[in-house]
Amino acid sequence: RVLGGGIVPGSVSLIGGDPGIGKSTLLLQVAASASPGRSMLYATGEESLGQVSMRARRLGLESASLSLLAQTDLEVILEAAQAAGATLLIVDSIQTVQFAGLGASAGAVTQLKECTAQLVRFAKTSGIAVVIIGHVTKEGAIAGPRVLEHLVDAVLYFESEAGSRFRIVRAVKNRFGAVNELA
């Protein structure tokens, strides 16, 4: 509902939220529940394959169409998505990914901008939808330069009221649907 009916092929969505709120778990659930016959690649730079696999098993999300990759090199991630015939690529998180040609460390402003721009180009040319997980600052904004939010098609925030067991996904930018939608 927040995305206006689903993830659009070739689109790039950025989802941010506080540490530990469940961004990785939410997107693992999205990938595992996508249409049968569609191939998804979940690329993690934050956890080992064993950790992600364990969470997927705990949630009952094992799916033959879901591939896992522990990798921070953007070129390797993009090649793996192409090779897998993925229709959806999830990058967890943009702050851990780097493009080797830049020489800056992962999380640096130049890396964040270049990696996001390359993911956008990749999505638009391949038709593969990309969902990027982004960390948030203490103030609640997605960490990194504001240009990240301008480059992507949708910006979502995953949040919770203090003391509540419920989580909310809120769209603040969506080129394919309404904003200020909640789910």
Give residue ranges: language-model regions.
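Phosphate-binding/switch region of NTP-binding enzymes
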Residues: V120-A183
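Residue-level signature of catalytic and energy-coupling elements of molecular machines
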Residues: V2, I15, V52, D92, ...
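Short gly/ser/thr-rich secondary-structure transition/capping motifs
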Residues: R1, L68-T72, K138
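Phosphate-binding P-loop
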Residues: V2-G10
